[in-house]
């Protein structure tokens, strides 16, 4: 596959008031993102509430996303887990239905060593012939995949990039400097993504894109091209939004914001709960500053 460059939306999983997955709205959101310039549709990751959807729902969300996208842009299918065998099965399904690549998170809770992390991802890449993007988010997984392990995995056929969600720009710089040709470095942190891309990163797996897809697409396009002036202007316009969308655990604020825009219900499944009322005015103000209201 060709490298994915630009804004990759970490798409929410829309749900009806009864908590069931709202597939018609999922299809509408995908069409909207493509029209707004989003470069890739990422489904059933953190923002897509992968921990609280069933395996059957997880697979159906991937299938629907691939079907609705219909080759217009790539689909990055969440297919990670803390069981290597289960992650392999999800990757196999993603390949079967035509996803372009998978996003595979560092195993969580069982806290593998660096060697365990390496063997986990190598096993997935060797078992399933589908491009794999690694996902390092130690704030959620506890285990932190160190740059040395990432660079080691970059040599494994089929491992094509990493979503680096630490927000650590120095770390990102070392990865960009040392990664082999063809290995893509993506930000997983909206607040620092512009810096990562201006320094040579390839794109941003974005929560903010759920509510501001065109602005995020324009920001990524400018930053990847080295247009610091344009990227800086858009970044500062979105800065308050980046901050408020993480005022409570993701995807709580972004689902509230999407509901405010009439895009989908704010429904989530327990243990996620609605956003605290005292944050509503601030998030609405940030949305106005970003030109969304």
From Swiss-Prot:
Keyword entries, A-Z: Amino-acid biosynthesis, Cytoplasm, Diaminopimelate biosynthesis, Lyase, Lysine biosynthesis, Schiff base
The Enzyme Commission number assigned here is 4.3.3.7
Q: Which residues bind pyruvate?
A: 47, 205
Q: Which reaction does it catalyse?
A: L-aspartate 4-semialdehyde + pyruvate = (2S,4S)-4-hydroxy-2,3,4,5-tetrahydrodipicolinate + H2O + H(+)
Q: Matching SUPFAM superfamilies, A to Z?
A: Aldolase
> Which residue positions does UniProt flag as site: Part of a proton relay during catalysis?
46, 109
| Annotated metabolic or biological route of this protein | Amino-acid biosynthesis; L-lysine biosynthesis via DAP pathway; (S)-tetrahydrodipicolinate from L-aspartate: step 3/4
Pfam families reported for this sequence: DHDPS
Q: What's an example GO BP annotation here?
A: diaminopimelate biosynthetic process
Q: Which InterPro entries match?
A: Aldolase_TIM, DapA, DapA-like, Schiff_base-form_aldolases_AS
Q: What does this protein do?
A: Catalyzes the condensation of (S)-aspartate-beta-semialdehyde [(S)-ASA] and pyruvate to 4-hydroxy-tetrahydrodipicolinate (HTPA).
Q: Oligomeric state and partners?
A: Homotetramer; dimer of dimers.
Would you tell me the protein name for this molecule? 4-hydroxy-tetrahydrodipicolinate synthase
**Organism of this sequence:** Leptothrix cholodnii (strain ATCC 51168 / LMG 8142 / SP-6) (Leptothrix discophora (strain SP-6))
């Amino acid at each position: 596959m060709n490298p994915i460059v630009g804004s990759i939306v970490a798409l929410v999983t829309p749900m009806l008031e009864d908590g069931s997955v709202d597939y018609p709205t999922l299809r509408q959101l995908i069409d909207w993102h493509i029209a707004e310039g989003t470069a890739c549709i990422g489904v059933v990751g953190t923002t897509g509430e992968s921990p609280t959807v069933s395996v059957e729902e997880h697979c159906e969300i991937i299938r629907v996303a691939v079907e609705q996208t219909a080759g217009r842009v790539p689909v990055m299918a969440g297919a990670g887990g803390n069981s290597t065998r289960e992650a392999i099965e999800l990757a196999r399904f993603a390949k079967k239905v035509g996803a372009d690549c998978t996003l595979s998170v560092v195993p969580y809770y069982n806290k593998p060593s660096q060697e365990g992390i390496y063997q986990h991802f190598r096993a997935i890449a060797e078992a399933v012939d589908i491009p794999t993007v690694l996902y390092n988010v130690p704030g959620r997984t506890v285990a932190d995949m160190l740059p040395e392990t990432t660079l080691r995995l970059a040599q494994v056929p089929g491992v094509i990039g990493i979503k680096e969600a630490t927000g650590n720009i120095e770390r990102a710089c070392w990865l960009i400097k040392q990664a082999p040709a063809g290995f893509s470095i993506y930000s997983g942190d909206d607040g620092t993504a512009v810096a990562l891309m201006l320094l040579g990163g390839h794109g941003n797996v974005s929560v903010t894109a759920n509510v501001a897809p065109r602005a995020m697409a324009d920001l990524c396009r400018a930053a990847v091209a080295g247009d610091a002036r344009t990227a800086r202007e858009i970044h500062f316009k979105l800065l308050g939004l980046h901050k408020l969308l993480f005022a409570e655990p993701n995807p709580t604020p972004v689902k509230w914001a999407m509901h405010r825009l009439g895009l989908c219900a704010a429904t989530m499944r327990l243990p996620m709960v609605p956003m605290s009322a005292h944050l509503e005015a601030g998030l609405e103000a940030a949305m106005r500053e970003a030109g969304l209201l």
